[in-house]
Amino acid sequence: WLLAANINLVGAETELVSVVGREIILREAMQASQDRFDFCLIDCAPSLGLLSLNALAASQEVLIPLQPHFLALQGFGKLLQTVDLVNRRINRDLKVSGVLLCMFDTRASLPNEVRADIERFLENARGSACAWADARLVPTFIRRNIKLAEAPSYGQTIFEYDPTCNGAEDYRRVAQFFLGVET
């Protein structure tokens, strides 16, 4: 299953504010249907609001997509703090499994510097009690590609819109990595 974020969720956060147990609504709904899927990907907006909290409460693993620039690193730190908090208070099974670099510009030096920083950070966490102690940097990355921005405007996935573009190839490699499929 893929639970994708979309514009229709805009009002959901406001509606959930007054609901008792609001941070575990998604987990309860998924538990009621867990025999219907082998795994589920939950796409969250880049925020740390109630919907993202629900996704963290319902998940076992977190894959963090990260743009390789300074401001994204600040958000990365805040997200890790939130994951740690959710792990301690709501969902003891929650772990960060990896970081996936997105919108990677192979012509610039900054993305490679950020990549090295993330690798060092994750290596330093090994053996600790934090929720990202076993996380790894995904060995492939999603290159900057205009086709990835165009596909949703046509109501299509990248695999429908342009299955041979760099973006589709990159996402295919990421899926193969997580499924353990040799390329």
Where are these regions (language model features)?
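Active-site donor-binding loop signature of nucleotide-sugar glycosyltransferases
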Residues: 5, 140, 144, 163
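P-loop/Walker-type NTP enzyme "switch/lid" segment
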Residues: 1-35, 90, 94, 104, ...
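Short, hydrophobic alpha-helical segments
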Residues: 178-183
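Conserved catalytic-core segment of NTP-binding enzymes
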Residues: 34-140
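C-terminal boundary of histidine-terminating zinc-finger modules
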Residues: 151-176
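Long, well-ordered amphipathic alpha-helical subdomains in the mid-to-C-terminal portions
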Residues: 136, 141, 147-157
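Residue-level preference for the first positions of well-ordered beta-strands
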Residues: 2, 39-41, 156
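Alpha-helical elements of Rossmann-like donor-binding domains used by nucleotide-donor carbohydrate transfer enzymes
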Residues: 25-28, 78, 82, 113-117, ...
